[in-house]
Amino acid sequence: MKDKEFGYAMKALRMVIRREWHRMTSRRLYLGVCVVLPLLCLFFMATIFGNGQMENIPVGIVDLDNTATSRNISRRISAAPTFRVTEHFTDEADARRALQQKDIYGYLVIPPRFEQKAVTGTGATLTYYYHYALLSVGSELMAAFENTLAPVALSPIVMQAEALGVSGEQIQTFLLPVEASTHPLYNPDMDYSIYLSQPFFFVLFQILILLTTVYSIGSELKFGSAGEWLEMARGNILTAVAGKLLPYTLIFSSIGILANYVLFGPLHIPFAGSLWLMNAVTVLFIIATQALAVFIYSVFPKIAYIISVVSMVGSLGATLSGVTFPVTAMYAPVHAASYLFPVRHFTEAAQAMIYFDAGFAYFWQSVATLFIFLLAALLILPLLKWWIKKEIREEAISASPSPCPPTALSTASVIRHEWHAIATNPAILLVLAGGIFLYGLLYNYMYAPNLVRKAPVAVVDLSHSALSREYIRLLDATPQTAVYGQTPNILEARQWMKQGDVAGILYLPADFEARVARGETSVFVLYAATDAFLNFKGLQESSARVMLVVNDAHRMEGTVFLPPQGLLAVASSAPVSVSGTALYNYTEGYGSYLIPAVLIVIIFQTMLMVIAMLTGEEAEARRKGIRLMRADSLKDTLRIVGGRTFVYFMLYVVFSLFLLGLLPHLFSIPHIGSGGDIVTMMIPFLLGTSFLALAVSRWFTDSEAPLLMIAFFSVGYIFLSGVSYPLELMPWYWQAAHYLFPAGPADVFFIVLDLSGRSCRTCFCKTEFNGWNAGRRMAADADDVDTSIGLWNFGALHYTPPLRKRKSEGIKKGYLSQTANLLLTLNLIL
């Protein structure tokens, strides 16, 4: 009997699987979200970072000395692989303007009489400035300037000592009695593709898995086929859900395994662990993500609402995975909430295997938690069945809407219709409330700590001396670092690192103090994990600062080892002072750099969603014989486009004031731009986004499908904008793609205006408005051709070489070009 029941259950499971496979192959949407988008995501993350190195970053040099020494410094800067000297300035103001315009990312100032002051030891100074509103670039430039100019700083004393017959090694030991040897583990080149490609592929992938799972189940209830689905499963909800999701699980698992082979194979991301174990954890992660989607949908199975919630959950997972900003540095409620996301546990397990070659014993808790998501979904399935039966009963007594004639078209009627459609649609109101207000507040709150503080470090002190204890005490006192514990065993410290308890290891050798006492250079070793670049950056900065303090305190003790002429060299010369200034992000915080870009993406993404959802609803209404608006002439088309654009524009003016005006004040995000300039920038951005959305929305045949496509790209917009990684270092095809979407250029433009303090007057000299090109929207109905036009391809603020002369002419040409392109657009609408 049991065998017979099992046979019936397996037969029902096979029937549900075949039914779902037929549904998947009957709509191009499923091919796109199950195959095309994941493969595109894999290609995107595998190629977006180019060679992964921050090299050839454009910088400038302001040489006000014009001597042999200053030219030698310029050659030294040009020879550094991080820099690409694109321009030599004769005025610091010109260099600052170039930095504001993003022609360069930093510049070095060599002041007048530098050589004379360096030779005479009268306070020679070198100052460098770097664009810290772009954190990744700013950090690289700061480190490169410090490393390149370090020999220059000591050169006056070294040259004077060598001229008096003292060896360079002897004077170098006196100047730097303690030196650091820093070893970034696993990723010694600090390659961004190694750091970000693997985790962010799965971050994007989990958004797609969540949305596809909810849509596949929710579409059964939406299109009235839930009864047939449950009946085919013989009334067993477990069979119904398992059969429906199994085809997606197999496809997503195949793509996840393929991604592992691509990332650790052709992309050459180092991986010494078990690929079989990594693939097994990947499949478990995919199933756990599907289980989370089932759980969320079962709580309240209204696809119009829940798919919006799930899109926000998926996007929040990108932040709470802890890849870029460590979750441990966030507020306690955010840290606790991160464990509600499967991607967080998968990231912990994957990084343990990738970075530390850890075995299963080190991340079994993460694997166990992924199984808990599956258990939670199984326990809530009876509730989902109850909802389905309730929906079937309501369908039986509900009356289908009767067709109604389209309303007379006028601009005022289009505006009234659009306002009414937005105000009476709970799903769209949820997107606006959640995407604009909740999302904006949450992102600011999550990144409110802004800086990574007290990164734990293990100390292996084999010296047990007064000097080593002083160094440890000073290191623990820095804001970036906290001493987790001390151990005499380096292997125990490595165990702490594998377990994720510490982010680095400080190794003080047995002769740490003895070498200083003998007049020799003493070296301490810092081993730092690179699974979070911000942790590594904090450890590196804190150890370097403590090293400088210790050197200053103990340098005079080394005078007994110098010959008289060495003392004369030290007394008669002085080192060059090297100072750096971070511009446009005075807090040097991660949130201060990322949040402005995220706010622009929120505006762009939610507007696309709202317009596409409304257009999808109209497509659903047309299939039911309800035609709300019909364009029979060019004038009608212009009324529809103009009326709709007016509604979206006015709505998002208010939202922009909240996101770009109120939130920066509430969360102390640096901003020095003019409100008028930002308004001027937002006008073409909002218009361009509206036109783009009207053009692409015709491809969506229901109101939920847009969220599958649009929400998926939320993280990609940030990368493509050039804020996280310099646009100049990306492959040419991604540089071109940057201009296809208004969000990319608008992100850069907003940062230039708001954080760099430029004005639109100077921006127009560099900005070329391509205008608005026409796009034709054709309805798919066989009995009617809808000639309403979607205007797309926002004149993408193409950045061209700066025009520093004839600024007023440039502004006039910019406006004339914009007007001409608008007239051309109107002529093309046919």
Predicted regions and their residues:
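Ser/Thr/Pro-rich, intrinsically disordered low-complexity segments
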Residues: 822-829
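Hydrophobic alpha-helical transmembrane segments of multi-pass membrane transport proteins
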Residues: 40-43, 183-263, 441, 581-664
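Extracytoplasmic/periplasmic domains immediately adjacent to an N-terminal transmembrane anchor
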Residues: 2-193, 395-592, 801, 814, ...
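Alpha-helical membrane-protein architecture signal
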Residues: 10, 14-18, 194, 233-234, ...
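Loop-to-transmembrane-helix entry motif
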Residues: 20, 24-31, 243-249, 282, ...
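Membrane-spanning alpha-helical segments of multipass transporters and channels
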Residues: 45, 66, 97, 250, ...
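Hydrophobic alpha-helical segments typical of transmembrane helices
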Residues: 69-73, 213, 225, 349, ...
